Regions:
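Histidine/acidic residue-rich metal-binding segments in metalloenzymes
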Residues: 1-21, 35-51, 112-127
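Active-site environment of divalent metal-dependent phosphoester hydrolases
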Residues: 4-11, 27-30, 59-63, 137-139
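Conserved, mostly hydrophobic/aromatic
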Residues: 24, 53, 134, 169
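Aromatic-lined glycan-binding groove of carbohydrate-active enzymes
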Residues: 39-95
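Extended C-terminal subregions enriched in glycine
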Residues: 52, 58, 101-110, 120-123
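Short acidic/histidine-rich active-site segments
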Residues: 55-57, 124-146
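Intrinsically disordered, low-complexity acidic Ser/Thr-rich regulatory segments
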Residues: 90-115
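Mid-to-C-terminal alpha-helical segments outside catalytic/metal-binding sites
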Residues: 147-170
Length: 170
C-alpha cells in the first residue's frame, strides 16, 4: 500500500482480512506534506491491523530538507544524461561520488533512517517496522553510509547503539 492515497489506505484496512504491508514508505512526521509517507494515524491503524511499515531510504522520504533541495539532485541526473549514463551505470559512480562530496547536505544519513524506525517503534512497536530501502527506485538519493545492501552493517551499528537488541533487529 505504499503508493496509495490516504483514503485508499483506510479503505484497504476496512476490507482487508490479512495484515497489510507498506513495503517502502516512511514517516510523514519527519516530512510534513509529503503524501507518499504515512501519517502517525495511518501507522497506528496499520499496527492495529497487524501490518508492517518498511522504511524507505530515499532522501525525500526521510527528510524535508532533501525534498527542498531536489533541484540540485536533478542537475546530477542531467549531467549523467549528458554523458549518456544513468545512476546505475558503473561508469557513473565516480561522478556520483564527487557530487555527493560536494553536496553532502542534500543527502540524509543512516541516523535519519534510524529516527524513522524509532518513531514507528514508539507508535506501534518493533514488530511492525521493517527495512524497505527502495534501492532500485530512488536513484541517487540514498543516505550517506547506506548506499546499498553492503552498508547495512552501518544501520545495524546505529540501531544497536540506540539500544536495539540483535533479536529486535532480526
Amino acid at each position: 500500500i505504499s503508493h496509495v492515497s490516504d483514503s485508499t489506505f483506510y479503505d484497504v484496512l476496512k476490507i482487508s482480512k490479512a495484515p497489510v504491508i507498506a513495503s517502502h514508505s516512511s514517516c510523514r512526521f519527519f516530512t510534513p506534506g509529503f503524501q507518499r509517507n504515512m501519517s502517525d494515524d495511518m501507522i497506528r491503524e496499520l499496527g492495529k491491523n497487524g501490518g508492517v511499515i518498511q522504511i524507505n531510504f530515499g532522501a525525500s522520504f526521510l527528510d524535508s530538507l532533501a525534498r527542498v533541495n531536489s533541484k540540485v539532485l536533478d542537475s546530477l541526473e542531467k549531467l549523467l544524461i549528458s554523458k549518456g549514463l544513468t545512476s546505475r551505470d558503473s561508469a557513473a559512480q565516480p561522478i556520483i561520488d564527487q557530487f555527493a562530496m560536494n553536496h553532502a547536505e542534500l543527502y540524509s544519513d543512516v541516523d535519519r533512517v534510524a529516527d524513522h524506525i524509532d518513531h514507528v517503534v514508539r507508535l506501534i512497536g518493533i514488530d511492525h517496522v521493517g527495512i524497505g530501502s527502495d534501492f532500485d527506485g530512488v536513484g541517487d538519493s540514498l543516505p550517506l553510509g547506506l548506499k546499498d545492501v553492503s552498508d547495512y552493517p552501518n544501520l545495524i551499528f546505529v540501531l544497536l547503539k540506540r539500544g536495539y537488541t540483535p533479536e529486535d533487529i532480526e
